[in-house]
């Protein structure tokens, strides 16, 4: 009896923890684990569950879950019929069981999409060979020991929790009665930003939709895997051709700094002005020297002519003086001759 109750509690714990376990997904895996539990049950000693114990059980509050056997002489499968029946999980008090008094209400759509997100990011982790990104624990205050009770849970029963008032006003009323192997399709309009608390890579997906990407798969990669894959790196795929180093120039050599263009232009202008000024000064010097030489030559010529004329004038003066002397001498001579004739006439 103790072994079967332990098996019952273990299966029920697996049922409750399977929505948060990524390894317990899929109907075929659940059925295979169910067969394993049945094989284990064969080795146990057959015991029957009385209807009184089944009615007073805190875990199973249903009268038809266990078939009563008073004799205890049936086979090993007589007490495992309850495993094939459907159970109504609404009767269980999960808040008291898992100590979730302060846990906020979770939307029903997030519980349904949790399995899809696990299947979506599982192949990405295997391809990139990176550590899986740390996801936020949707059960805020659950201890780690309770979460890792059973890594291979056989069933995936989901209990619809009451939604928040703001979420109920914007989404239609869905009555979830999920069975084994059922699929849930949720439109994009029903998905609210609340899913960012459970999926840490939603902001990266939104950024990838804004910028054009090379792949049309629509899967957003994690930052670790994004850095790991060279074909999706933004530095190599969107780098401008100017930023790539030329093959002729080595990477270590840097271009030498040149003078600013303004300084070189002003220096050229200054040198040109200085050259023009020097040329003009030289031209003025040559012109002045030529002018002085010309004036000097003219002056020398004038002085030479003046000297010659002065010499002629002096010569003429001397000649005039000599003539004047001769005239005076002749006058004196004529006067003496008159006087002498006059004396001769007067006796």
UniProtKB/Swiss-Prot annotation:
Q: Where is the composition biased (Basic and acidic residues)?
A: 269-283
Region entry Disordered: which residue ranges?
202-296
Sequence ranges assigned to domain bZIP in this UniProt record:
274-337
Motif BetaTrCP degron motif — list its residue ranges. Answer: 213-222
What does the UniProt PTM comment say about this protein?
A: Ubiquitinated by SCF(BTRC) in response to mTORC1 signal, followed by proteasomal degradation and leading to down-regulate expression of SIRT4. Interaction with EP300/p300 inhibits ubiquitination by SCF(BTRC).
The coiled-coil segments of this chain are: none
Quick one: where's region Interaction with GABBR1?
Answer: 301-337
The UniProt entry's GO biological process terms, in alphabetical order, are: bone mineralization; cellular response to amino acid starvation; cellular response to glucose starvation; cellular response to hypoxia; cellular response to leucine starvation; cellular response to oxidative stress; cellular response to UV; circadian regulation of gene expression
Q: Where is this region: Leucine-zipper?
A: 302-330
Where along the chain is composition biased (Polar residues)? 228-238
Instruction: List residues modified as Phosphothreonine.
Output: 211
SS bond list: none
Q: Tell me which domain of life the UniProt entry assigns to the organism this sequence originates from.
A: Eukaryota
Q: Which residues carry this modification: Phosphoserine?
A: 213, 217, 222, 229, 233, 243, 246
Keyword vocabulary terms for this entry? Acetylation, Activator, Biological rhythms, Cell membrane, Cytoplasm, Cytoskeleton, DNA-binding, Hydroxylation, Isopeptide bond, Membrane, Nucleus, Phosphoprotein, Repressor, Transcription, Transcription regulation, Ubl conjugation
4-hydroxyproline: residues carrying this PTM: 234
Cell location:
Nucleus; Nucleus speckle; Cytoplasm; Cell membrane
**Cross-linked sites for Glycyl lysine isopeptide (Lys-Gly) (interchain with G-Cter in SUMO2):** 256, 268
Of which family is this protein a member? Belongs to the bZIP family.
Q: How would you summarize the oligomeric state and partners of this protein?
A: Binds DNA as a homodimer and as a heterodimer. Heterodimer; heterodimerizes with CEBPB. Heterodimer; heterodimerizes with DDIT3/CHOP. Interacts with CEP290 (via an N-terminal region). Interacts with NEK6, DAPK2 (isoform 2) and ZIPK/DAPK3. Interacts (via its leucine zipper domain) with GABBR1 and GABBR2 (via their C-termini). Forms a heterodimer with TXLNG in osteoblasts. Interacts (via its DNA binding domain) with FOXO1 (C-terminal half); the interaction occurs in osteoblasts and regulates glucose homeostasis through suppression of beta-cell proliferation and a decrease in insulin production.
Query: What does this chain do?
Result: Transcription factor that binds the cAMP response element (CRE) (consensus: 5'-GTGACGT[AC][AG]-3') and displays two biological functions, as regulator of metabolic and redox processes under normal cellular conditions, and as master transcription factor during integrated stress response (ISR). Binds to asymmetric CRE's as a heterodimer and to palindromic CRE's as a homodimer. Core effector of the ISR, which is required for adaptation to various stress such as endoplasmic reticulum (ER) stress, amino acid starvation, mitochondrial stress or oxidative stress.
- Comment text on domains: The BetaTrCP degron motif promotes binding to BTRC when phosphorylated.
Q: State the protein's name.
A: Cyclic AMP-dependent transcription factor ATF-4
Protein species of origin: Rattus norvegicus
State the organism's lineage. Answer: Eukaryota, Metazoa, Chordata, Craniata, Vertebrata
> Gene name on record?
Atf4
């Amino acid at each position: 009896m103790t072994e079967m109750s332990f098996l019952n509690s273990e299966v029920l714990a697996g049922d409750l923890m399977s929505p948060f376990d990524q390894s317990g997904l899929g109907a075929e895996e659940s059925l295979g684990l169910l067969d394993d539990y049945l094989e284990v049950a064969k080795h146990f000693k057959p015991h029957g569950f009385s209807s009184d114990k089944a009615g007073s059980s805190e875990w199973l509050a249903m009268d038809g879950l266990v078939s009563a056997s008073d004799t205890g002489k049936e086979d090993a499968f007589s007490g495992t019929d309850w495993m094939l029946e459907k159970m109504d999980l609404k009767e269980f008090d999960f808040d008291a069981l898992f100590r979730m008094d302060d846990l906020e209400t979770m939307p029903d759509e997030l519980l349904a999409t949790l399995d899809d997100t696990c299947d979506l990011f599982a192949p990405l982790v295997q391809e990139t060979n990176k550590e899986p990104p740390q996801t936020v624990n949707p059960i805020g205050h659950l201890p780690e020991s309770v979460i890792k009770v059973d890594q291979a849970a056989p069933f995936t029963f989901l209990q619809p929790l009451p939604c928040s008032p703001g979420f109920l006003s914007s989404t239609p009323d869905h009555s979830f009665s999920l069975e084994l192997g059922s699929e849930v399709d949720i439109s994009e309009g029903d998905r609210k930003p609340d899913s960012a608390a459970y999926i840490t890579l939603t902001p990266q997906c939104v950024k990838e939709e804004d910028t054009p990407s090379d792949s049309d798969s629509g899967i957003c990669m994690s930052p670790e895997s994004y850095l790991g894959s060279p074909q999706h790196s933004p530095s190599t795929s969107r780098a401008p051709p100017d930023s790539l180093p030329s093959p002729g120039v080595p990477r270590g050599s840097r271009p030498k700094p040149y003078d600013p263009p303004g300084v070189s232009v002003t220096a050229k202008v200054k040198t040109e002005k200085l050259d023009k000024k020097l040329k003009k000064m030289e031209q003025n010097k040559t012109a002045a020297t030529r002018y002085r030489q010309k004036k000097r030559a003219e002056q020398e010529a004038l002085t030479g002519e003046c000297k010659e004329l002065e010499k002629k004038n002096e010569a003429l003066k001397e000649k005039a003086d000599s003539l004047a002397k001769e005239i005076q001498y002749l006058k004196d001579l004529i006067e003496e001759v008159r006087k002498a004739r006059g004396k001769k006439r007067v006796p």
